[in-house]
Amino acid sequence: MNEENLQADLNLSAEIKLYYDLFVPESAAGNSPLLIAVHGYGAHKRYMMREARLVAPKNFVIASVQGPHQHFRQTDDGYRIGFGWLTDHKAEESVALHHKFLLDLIDKLALENLIDRQRIFLYGFSQSCALNFRFAFTHPQIPKAVIGVSGGIPGDL
C-alpha cells in the first residue's frame, strides 16, 4: 500500500444542537443573576436542574446545560442514556464547544432581557468542574463565581 497519497485527519464542520433547560422565577425582572448548571459524566440536564434549584437563591434564573456526547449506561433494570462533555480524541475541541455553548447561552439570555451579565455563576459537578474552571480562566471577566462539587482544577492550569 502506498502511504504517500494518504491524507489523514481531514475534517468537515457540522452543526449540532445543544440542549438546555431553563428555569425563570416569577420574580425575574430582566436583571436576574444566572446560575449555569453543568452536569457530570453520565448524567443529564434534568438531574443538574434539580440540584441547582436546591442550592440557588430564589431570584436566580437557572440554565441547566447538557453535554453533547451521549452514551448508554447500564442500570439495574436495563440501560439509560447518559451524557458527557469530553472525548479523549481531540479533547480541546470538546473544551471549545463547552465554552461556545456557555457564551452563546449567556448572549441569548441577555438579549432576551432575562439576566444581568455582571452576575453569572457556574455550578459544576465532577467532570464539568474542570470545564467550568477552564472557562473561568479563559474568560475571567464573565463568571462572578465558580462552584465545583466533587471535581477539581485541571492539572495543566
What are these regions (language model features)?
Residues 1-10, 120-122, 127:
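An N-terminal hydrophobic leader/cap segment in hydrolases
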Residues 1-4, 43-47, 104-105, 129-130, ...:
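Short amphipathic alpha-helical surface micro-motifs
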Residues 3-7, 30-34, 90, 137-144:
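A generic short-segment signal for beta-strand/edge and adjacent turn/coil regions
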Residues 118-157:
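Primarily recognizes the serine-hydrolase "nucleophile elbow" in alpha/beta-hydrolase
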Residues 5-18, 42-43, 142-153:
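Short coil-to-helix leader/linker segments, especially the first N-terminal amphipathic alpha-helix
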